[in-house]
Curated annotation (Swiss-Prot):
InterPro entries: Fruct_sucro_rep, HTH_LacI, LacI/GalR-like_sensor, Lambda_DNA-bd_dom_sf, Peripla_BP_I. PROSITE patterns: HTH_LACI_1, HTH_LACI_2. SUPFAM superfamilies: lambda repressor-like DNA-binding domains, Periplasmic binding protein-like I. This is Sucrose operon repressor. Repressor for the scr operon. Binds D-fructose as an inducer. Pfam families: LacI, Peripla_BP_3. It comes from Salmonella typhimurium. GO terms for biological process: response to fructose. Keywords: DNA-binding, Plasmid, Repressor, Transcription, Transcription regulation. Residues 8-27 bind DNA. The gene is scrR. One of its GO terms (molecular function) is transcription cis-regulatory region binding. The lineage of its organism: Bacteria, Pseudomonadati, Pseudomonadota, Gammaproteobacteria, Enterobacterales. Residues 6-63 form the HTH lacI-type domain.
Length: 334
């Protein structure tokens, strides 16, 4: 038999107080409105005894909010997005906010569907890593509810934004390694239309230039950010060269995953290749193959996204609407 949900009315009757008094106490306003301490303690004791939980629907009706935030990402299996989502969910949980997560599979049509689903669920705000070609839909949506873009900036959007500065650390990483590989340094990237792809290629090109090396067009190979694309691009490159490349930069952790899988399957993990990548993973410390990386601070990315969306939901104007965060370099080659 289904257990009856305990209501404020039930608690009020057991405590011998009015429903209004019980409601004030359970909503944390009893002391402020001079409800006697003994009465407050009696109401709270009965609520604890019955494991009372306030209705989120009633709370939403009172302040016209759903206390939910939507997060839209290309794929949750991506290590960077997974860590970001975990950090953001913890921040939301601590604030009593529910985080709703949807994936787009890098498909603009699917992105429109999941965004509309979020709107239908009346989220208070949305944080989006968009695969759209431009920000037109989000400019329109931002008139209806707060929107924060992260990781990607479609067509130099003026919307609130949180991103890692990809160019500066990538340039520094490559400039320090390139002098050892002046005759050959390959770049495997994702979709060229996405801002992270462009920024990381810009940093790669600048790093070569700082080392006095001109980028050769054939060194740049683009696909998408799925591990299978990294596998296929690296396989084609090895077939083209008849050997593994001497030096390689992958523009994301997923691409490097595909490269490592190919190398493992073809017994190339002990080959003489200098691997570098944007994005770090704790497992890289356990590999015999050393990998130098640009490491994003996903905790800071999540905090700044949460800070921006929270202020916008409250109707405040953040001091800085577009935030570019620094990254660190992880050198594993001696």
């Amino acid at each position: 038999m289904k257990t009856k949900r305990v209501t404020i009315k039930d608690i009020a009757e057991q405590a011998g107080v009015s429903k209004a008094t019980a409601s004030l106490v359970l909503n944390g306003r009893g002391k402020e409105l001079r409800v006697a301490q003994e009465t407050r303690e009696r109401v709270l004791s009965i609520a604890r005894k019955h494991h009372y939980q306030p209705s989120i629907h009633a709370r939403s009706l009172r302040n016209n909010r759903s206390h939910t935030i939507g997060l839209v990402v290309p794929e949750i299996t991506n290590h960077g997005f997974a860590v970001f989502a975990h950090e953001l969910e913890m921040l939301c949980r601590e604030a009593g906010v529910q985080l709703l997560i949807s994936c787009t599979d890098e498909n603009p049509g699917q992105e429109s569907v999941v965004v509309n689903n979020m709107i239908a669920r009346q989220v208070d705000g949305m944080i989006v890593a968009s695969c759209m070609h431009n920000d037109a839909d989000y400019l329109k949506l931002s008139q209806q509810l707060p929107v924060v873009l992260f990781d990607r900036c479609p067509n130099e959007s003026a919307l609130p934004l949180v991103m890692t500065d990809s160019i500066t650390p990538t340039a520094e990483l490559i400039s320090r390694i390139a002098p050892q590989h002046s005759d050959e340094f390959w770049f495997l990237g994702g979709q060229a239309r996405l801002s992270p792809s462009r920024d990381r290629l810009t940093g790669f090109t600048q790093g070569l230039a700082q080392a006095g090396i001109a980028l050769r067009p054939e060194w740049v190979i683009n696909g998408n950010y799925h591990p299978s694309s990294g596998y296929e691009m690296f396989a084609a490159l090895c077939a083209r060269l008849g050997r593994p490349p001497k030096a390689l930069f992958t523009a994301a952790c997923g691409l490097l995953e595909g490269v490592l899988r190919y190398m493992s399957q073809h017994h190339l993990l002990d080959s003489d290749i200098h691997l570098t990548s944007f994005d770090d993973h704790y497992l890289y410390d356990s590999l015999s193959l050393r990998i130098d990386t640009v490491q994003q601070d996903n905790r800071q990315l999540a905090w700044h996204c949460y800070d921006l969306i929270s202020q916008l939901i409250e109707g405040d104007t953040p001091e800085t609407l577009q935030r570019y965060l620094p990254a660190t370099l992880q050198f594993r080659h001696q």
